[in-house]
From Swiss-Prot:
Membrane among keywords: no
Cited SUPFAM superfamilies: dUTPase-like
Protein name in the entry: Deoxyuridine 5'-triphosphate nucleotidohydrolase
Its job: This enzyme is involved in nucleotide metabolism: it produces dUMP, the immediate precursor of thymidine nucleotides and it decreases the intracellular concentration of dUTP so that uracil cannot be incorporated into DNA.
GO molecular-function terms, A-Z: dUTP diphosphatase activity; magnesium ion binding
Needed co-factor(s): Mg(2+)
EC number: 3.6.1.23
Species of the source: Shewanella baltica (strain OS185)
HAMAP family from the UniProt entry: dUTPase_bact
Annotated residues for binding of substrate: 71-73, 84, 88-90, 98
Reactions catalysed: dUTP + H2O = dUMP + diphosphate + H(+)
Pfam families in the cross-refs: dUTPase
Family from the record: Belongs to the dUTPase family.
Length: 152
C-alpha cells in the first residue's frame, strides 16, 4: 500500500545531483535522508550539529506520522547517532526536515555533501483518550518495573 505524502524540494540539488528519497528495495521500511550541506562538515567528538536534508514534507493524514531514525552503519562504525535519538514529524508539520547528528565517538567525523545520514519512516498514529480509574484490572505483570521480567 502506498500513501501519497506531499514533498517540497528546498535544495535544487535534490532530483538533479542527488535522488529524491526512495525505498531501496520492496521490503525497505525507510527512505534515506541526505546531508544537503555546502561543504564537507567535520563533526568533532561530542559535538551535535543540525543538518538540513533539503526537503520538507506534509503528511496531512492525522492517522500517520513520520519518524527520523539513525542509519545503523553510521552509529556502529563511526559513532554518529541522532542527537535527539529519534525525530517525530507530526502530520500537520510543513517545515524543513533537519537531522540532529551527535558524534559520540572519540574521533572527528567528516560528513560529505549528499551523504546518507538518517532514514525517514512513516508510522500509524493512534490518539488516545484517557479514561480515569481508581484501580487497574489485575495483570500478570502488575507493577513490576525495570528488569522485572528477567533475562531468561
Amino acid at each position: 500500500m502506498k500513501t501519497p505524502i506531499e514533498l517540497k524540494i528546498l535544495d535544487s540539488r535534490i532530483g538533479s545531483e542527488f535522488p529524491l528519497p526512495a525505498y531501496a528495495t520492496p521490503g525497505s521500511a525507510g527512505m534515506d535522508l541526505r546531508a544537503m550541506i555546502d561543504t564537507t562538515l567535520t563533526i568533532a567528538p561530542g559535538e551535535t550539529v543540525l543538518i538540513p536534508t533539503g526537503i520538507a514534507i506534509h503528511v496531512a493524514d492525522p492517522g500517520l506520522a513520520a519518524v527520523i531514525l539513525p542509519r545503523s552503519g553510521l552509529g556502529h562504525k563511526h559513532g554518529i547517532v541522532l542527537g535527539n535519538l529519534v525525530g517525530l514529524i507530526d502530520s500537520d508539520y510543513q517545515g524543513p526536515l533537519m537531522v540532529s547528528c551527535w558524534n559520540r565517538s572519540d574521533s572527528p567525523f567528516a560528513l560529505e555533501i549528499g551523504d546518507r545520514l538518517a532514514q525517514l519512516v512513516f508510522v500509524p498514529v493512534v490518539q488516545a483518550q484517557f479514561k480515569l480509574v481508581d484501580e487497574f484490572d489485575s495483570s500478570d505483570r502488575g507493577e513490576g518495573g525495570f528488569g522485572h521480567s528477567g533475562t531468561k
